[in-house]
Amino acid sequence: MKFWLQQLGLAVLCASSAAARTAEHAYEFKSVAITGGGYITGIVGHPAEKNLLYARTDIGSTYRWEQELNKWIPLTDFLGPEDENLLGTESVAMDPTDPNRLYLAQGRYLSSNNSAFFVSNDRGATFTRYRAPFPMGANELGRNNGERLAVNPFKPNELWMGTRNAGLMKSSDRAKTWTNVTNFPDAAANGIGITFVIFDPQHEGTIYVGACIPGGLYYTTDGGKNWESIPGQPMQWDPSLLVYPNETQPQSAGPQPMKAVLASNGALYVTYADYPGPWGVAYGAVHVYNTTASIWTDITPNANNTSPKPYTPQAFPAGGYCGLSVAPDDPDTVVVVSLDRDPGPALDSMYLSRDGGKTWKDVSQLSTPPGSGGYWGHPIAEAALSNGTTVPWLSFNWGPQWGGYGAPSPVKGLTKFGWWMTAVLIDPSNPDHVLYGTGATIWATDTIAQADKNLAPKWYIQAQGIEETVTLAMISPREGAHLLSGAGDINGFRHDDLDTPQPMFGLPVFSNLNTLDWAGQRPEVIVRGGPCGHQYPDGCGQAAYSTDGGSEWTKFQTCIKGVNTSVHNPGVMTIDASGKYVVWTSAMYVVSPSVQAVTPPANDSGPYASSDWGKTWTSPRGLTVQTPYISADRVQPKTFYAFSGGVWYVSTDGGLSYDAFNATKLGLPAHTGAVPVVSVDRAGEIWLALGSNGVYHTTDFGKRWKRITHKGTVADLITVGAAAPGSTKPALFIRGSPGHPKKSDYGIYRSDDNGSTWDRVDDDDHRYGGFNLIQGDPRVYGRVYLGTGGRGLLYADIVPGQSDKEGNVPGTGGI
């Protein structure tokens, strides 16, 4: 299949201009330090500029390593919610002739028509943006491969891009416009497509291209006028790999190229697998091609060429290979990493060769203390930054909840050496410095040469500054830790210190933590819920409560109907002011890009109530819908609220029964629903964010409502924070746009006068792809916590003595 595409680029200058603000005070933005928290899909280093490294992620965009600050710097925080799809990097390209030039191919999903190229002349401090004429898939299958985007070292204004469904593309004007290379033999338009483009820096016109199909390697020696399949490339699986062919068959007819590196001596190293990855891979191989002699050699690590010997018995199938790096100054120094041996044994391994793949050292095995039973891992004490700051959550509390990818090490005291280790780099400016990414973080060593002596390199975490979590829940109680959070994939945290990584919540450990709440008059009592694949014999693995502010947890005795080990989302939990009555609904809601309720299939009851920590659950009278729009009064015990389908519900008996009121008779718009947001210190005071209907407020438990915002206001989310000094009115924060009387951009706003006037909190440089959740702090005036869909968790504080005319400031990033 061949394509021809050309599109004029619409250039937009991003990141550097000051934003118009309405705020009286400037804000400082900081990351709540989790450190990592997501999948690192690629790490690249400039071939000539020392310490110039970039890390790309699937849903958190790209970071640049800043050596003087000893941290990674996010490059695309200017992206707003309308560009959430651009907060994922498909590929990174550096100009080998100019270290200041950087190119990012942005776009999370093929289903979106919003993909773009970001072009920088200052290492990502500012970008010019050009719309891409084809979709990208930074969070799709095959995101572990690459790099798809490459700069011609002989014509540095020329870029080539291997796409997922539009074939091989070429730009001669630095990504402004693109044309299809129509004579390329196979567009491989299978949704994975062409996964890497490599220029030979020693021979002008020679380009190597790989597609994720068997026999997918091609080359040209005349700048793309003519293409040939690389002769002799592996086309069929080695029969010796298929030890039990009737048990697990390869998913491809032959090896599929994953990544490739052209060494300085002309050797082309290629990793292979039977599936695009990062999951689902069962078989793989590593080969090297002598481009001068046109000879292929199988250099796959095996029992005959690897030291220490592979662990036996090894789980079958043995996985594939993806991660690959070659030392620029030594073409025989190679690192490869296996893919998808998890859950083992033996787990995925990093292999180091000093002789071009003739022999290998199993670095993962050497790095693991004796007696692990093939479950390679770092001692948990190594899960720390180079300055000693620990990242304790990487233990995953050794909780039996996931199984498979990302599961905690089965060996207590170890954290897995890694999974999805598809991003690996021998630092071009320091070959003893090796970095590799996982599904959660970046590990690094400065002593990889220890493996040559069959010793363990010293490892540390080099992910500081990278914050990639998806925030699913937040609370800020009146006492104890200022913030507790729930995240996608990594459970949740009690943030005793916002600026250093914290331990993960204890058992039961959830993969996601979707719901949190605290008791208004007993803030040390907290409930949480999330999916858990482990069946506990002594309680419900999907819900827990704490009576000490979130340090220790106890499982609920039973789950509500519809929540079990196979349910991915456990719904919403809330607890009354006394800390004795819990209401739990199996419905959920999503808030990005808009607030939308999702009701469960079995919708035969209202939210269930319990006063004995889940020993018994009662279906209520008066509310027969599993609505997610529920909350508890923070002051009056046994009082719960719900607003769903244009009906306002109130319970004063611990959720056993509800009185229902037609919204229009109370002063509310018809056919609406939202989470009731309650006052921290006044019974019956509630706010509702009703989208284009604005914000409504009541002080009498919902008997009478009043719209407090101007006509034209949009408010999708609302939260309550501490009152301004000298005021009795709590600060309100909304995600939306106040509209009239002053036209405003969509963002985060604060009101100190109950909605009469609004000040802008965020600005055009601090948008982070939009915010899934917002949470005010009842103890710190002006502070708001901001949960994102891939850029972690942030908090914004007013800068003392600085007006907004002086500008918002980025802060320290948490570490």
Curated annotation (Swiss-Prot):
Glycans are attached at N113, N180, N246, N290, N304, N387, N564, N603, N662, N754. Residues 1-19 form the signal peptide. The keyword Signal applies. GO terms for biological process: cell wall organization; polysaccharide catabolic process; xyloglucan metabolic process. It catalyses: Hydrolysis of cellobiose from the reducing end of xyloglucans consisting of a beta-(1->4)-linked glucan carrying alpha-D-xylosyl groups on O-6 of the glucose residues. To be a substrate, the first residue must be unsubstituted, the second residue may bear a xylosyl group, whether further glycosylated or not, and the third residue, which becomes the new terminus by the action of the enzyme, is preferably xylosylated, but this xylose residue must not be further substituted. CDD domains: Sialidase_non-viral (cd15482). The active site is at D58 (nucleophile), D489 (proton donor). InterPro entries: BNR_rpt (IPR002860), WD40/YVTN_repeat-like_dom_sf (IPR015943), Xyloglucanase_GH74 (IPR052025). BNR repeats lie at residues 118-128, 218-228, 351-361, 545-555, 649-658, 696-706, 749-759. GO terms for molecular function: oligoxyloglucan reducing-end-specific cellobiohydrolase activity. It is an enzyme of class 3 (hydrolase). It is found in: Secreted. Its EC number is 3.2.1.150. Transmembrane segments: none annotated. The keyword DNA repair does not apply. Keywords: Carbohydrate metabolism, Cell wall biogenesis/degradation, Glycoprotein, Glycosidase, Hydrolase, Polysaccharide degradation, Repeat, Secreted, Signal. Its main location: secreted. GO terms for cellular component: extracellular region. Oligoxyloglucan-reducing end-specific xyloglucanase involved in degradation of xyloglucans. Releases the first two glycosyl segments from oligoxyloglucans. Active against cotton xyloglucan, tamarind xyloglucan and tamarind xyloglucan oligomers. Belongs to the glycosyl hydrolase 74 family. This is Probable oligoxyloglucan-reducing end-specific xyloglucanase.
